[in-house]
Amino acid sequence: MTPKLILASSSPFRRMLMENAGLSFEAHAARIDERAVEAPLENAGAKPDAVALVLARAKAEEVSSRFPDSLVIGSDQTMSLGDSVFHKPTDLADAASHLQALSGVTHRLNSAVAIVSDGVVLWEHLAHAQLTMRPLTVEFIARHLARVGERALSSVGAYQLEGEGIQLFEKIEGDYFTILGLPMLPLLKKLRELGAIDG
């Protein structure tokens, strides 16, 4: 019997990616405090990609504890600019600060995914993308945030590449799915290997 697939996420974008791929799954948000997990890692000097892996694993493990006979997919994404790690902005002023810091420079997205079953990590994967934002004026940032509003608070970096955020960039290197926070091609390959989807 094929195990039930569960996405350990409340993200509508991650759900959309899995739905668009034709996967049959349930989505259940992980009951973890992400900041409580990542703060000690960051304080210890963990790299942003390592933090993403730990969070992806933690989300999948928590949901797996509630649905032990399922294959649980956890994912997370961190964003870094040099040694600085960015988190989702807390308000529109914070979003403006993020966009000002990213203006005219290249930053990195680190997207991690893990599969857990019965509390055991079966697989994990990390992918990276490099994004270069075009130079933005303070006035343009204000107009952009006025248009997108609270949506800017739902992603690290205060942009949503799948929407108006694409207008902020001049160069992107990396897989589209990695940028959206769920590396679909390696995930689908692993799900086929595990017999969870037809292949």
From Swiss-Prot:
Its EC number is 3.6.1.-. PANTHER family: BIFUNCTIONAL DTTP/UTP PYROPHOSPHATASE/METHYLTRANSFERASE PROTEIN-RELATED, BIFUNCTIONAL DTTP_UTP PYROPHOSPHATASE_METHYLTRANSFERASE PROTEIN-RELATED. GO terms for molecular function: nucleoside triphosphate diphosphatase activity. Its cofactor is a divalent metal cation. NCBIfam families: maf (TIGR00172), PRK02478.1 (NF002690). HAMAP family: Maf (MF_00528). Keywords: Cytoplasm, Hydrolase, Nucleotide metabolism. This is 7-methyl-GTP pyrophosphatase. Belongs to the Maf family. YceF subfamily. The keyword Hydrolase applies. InterPro entries: ITPase-like_fam (IPR029001), Maf-like (IPR003697). Gene3D superfamilies: 3.90.950.10. The record marks 13, 77, 162 as: Important for substrate specificity. It holds the Pfam family Maf. The active site is at 76 (proton acceptor). It catalyses: N(7)-methyl-GTP + H2O = N(7)-methyl-GMP + diphosphate + H(+). Nucleoside triphosphate pyrophosphatase that hydrolyzes 7-methyl-GTP (m(7)GTP). May have a dual role in cell division arrest and in preventing the incorporation of modified nucleotides into cellular nucleic acids. The keyword Cytoplasm applies. It is found in: Cytoplasm. GO terms for biological process: nucleotide metabolic process. It comes from Rhizobium johnstonii (strain DSM 114642 / LMG 32736 / 3841). Its main location: cytoplasm.
